[in-house]
Amino acid sequence: CRASYYFRQSTRDAEVMHILAKAGVHVSYHFEELAEYAKQNRLRSPAAVQEAMPEIQAQFVENLHELRREFGLPMNVVCSHGDWMNRYLKMPNRVLTHDDGLRTRAGIISETYDDEVMMPFAAYVSDDDPPTYWARGNPFELIQQGTSPLGILTHPKLWRSHWSSNARELTVRIREALQFKFGKGWK
């Protein structure tokens, strides 16, 4: 069994990250610059996002280098975060890492959704909101069936996190959605 932990800018916890890294766990960046840039700059179309891609990439590289400096970790395998804005745009954050030049500049070996990362898994499941709990299969059933290797994606907020953290994040999402729906100046 091997685990990796990816931290967003908004969820990074220096103490936890250091403890995990010292224990030999892979710790890296859970990035979301594309969605964040689109929301901050009121972009509503993939074309507008593509036009801004050089700025988005620069922000991503800057954030990644800052995390590497702060934690002294290679962070050369990164993981894209999914946001409501990505679903609206039909454009995942990982679009950033499709650029080989960016990968070279940023020192990225792979992104967790790259084919070479996903292909070895016989099955890949993700936790989901109750009452479903699992998307793409139940890991307990897959283990009993002898499915191996198995990739399992989990999110702390779906299992046991501090209620105020979840409430705060939900409040931000609602505010963003209302601004998006009723705000002026979206491109």
Predicted regions and their residues:
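Hydrophobic "anchor" residues on beta-strands that sit immediately upstream
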Residues: 26
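Terminal accessory/targeting
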Residues: 1-4, 11-23, 34, 39-187
